[in-house]
């Protein structure tokens, strides 16, 4: 089982799919990474050689922030917006949608379960 960026990649999946198990690497970045290292996207994870694994590891570490570093960066960005008091920071603080979605109806994921108000009948 190959281990990249602190993540165990699934054994029987194609490399193109297996790389997306790493936080910060989606389908497009996985394809770009395989092209840079010269590894076939159709190759299965358990067929990787040690040289290929080290090549992937080197490119990932040199090029992008992934996993813990990326998660810390995102959290720090959110914390900074909250501290400076910008609109997005206020929305984060109040637990409401940040990117301009409507909240009169919907937005239940951010707002949590519906709170019923007593005495609101016809």
From Swiss-Prot:
Name the domain of life.
Bacteria
Please give the residue ranges the record annotates as the region Disordered. Answer: 95-122
**GO biological-process terms attached to the record:** translation
InterPro entries the UniProt entry points to: Rbsml_uS13_C, Ribosomal_uS13, Ribosomal_uS13-like_H2TH, Ribosomal_uS13_bac-type, Ribosomal_uS13_CS
Q: Where is the signal peptide?
A: none
Q: Which Pfam families match?
A: Ribosomal_S13
Q: Name one GO cellular component term.
A: small ribosomal subunit
Q: Which UniProt keywords are present, listed alphabetically?
A: Ribonucleoprotein, Ribosomal protein, RNA-binding, rRNA-binding, tRNA-binding
Q: Which Gene Ontology molecular-function terms are recorded?
A: rRNA binding; structural constituent of ribosome; tRNA binding
Quote the PANTHER family the UniProt record gives: 30S RIBOSOMAL PROTEIN S13/40S RIBOSOMAL PROTEIN S18, SMALL RIBOSOMAL SUBUNIT PROTEIN US13M
HAMAP family attached to this UniProt entry: Ribosomal_uS13
Q: Which NCBIfam families match?
A: uS13_bact
Q: Which family does it belong to?
A: Belongs to the universal ribosomal protein uS13 family.
Biological function: Located at the top of the head of the 30S subunit, it contacts several helices of the 16S rRNA. In the 70S ribosome it contacts the 23S rRNA (bridge B1a) and protein L5 of the 50S subunit (bridge B1b), connecting the 2 subunits; these bridges are implicated in subunit movement. Contacts the tRNAs in the A and P-sites.
Q: How does it assemble?
A: Part of the 30S ribosomal subunit. Forms a loose heterodimer with protein S19. Forms two bridges to the 50S subunit in the 70S ribosome.
Record's protein name: Small ribosomal subunit protein uS13
Source organism (scientific name):
Corynebacterium diphtheriae (strain ATCC 700971 / NCTC 13129 / Biotype gravis)
- Gene symbol here is rpsM
């Amino acid at each position: 089982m190959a281990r990249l960026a602190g993540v165990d990649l699934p054994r029987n999946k194609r490399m193109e799919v297996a790389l997306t198990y790493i936080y910060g690497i989606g389908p497009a970045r996985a394809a770009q990474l395989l092209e840079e290292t010269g590894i076939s996207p159709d190759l299965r994870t358990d067929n990787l050689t040690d040289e290929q694994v080290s090549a992937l590891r080197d490119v990932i570490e040199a090029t992008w922030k992934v996993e813990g570093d990326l998660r810390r960066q995102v959290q720090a960005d959110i914390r900074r917006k909250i501290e400076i008091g910008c609109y997005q920071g206020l929305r984060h603080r109040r637990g409401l949608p940040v990117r301009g979605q409507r909240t009169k109806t919907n937005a239940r994921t951010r707002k949590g379960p519906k709170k019923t108000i007593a005495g609101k009948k016809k």
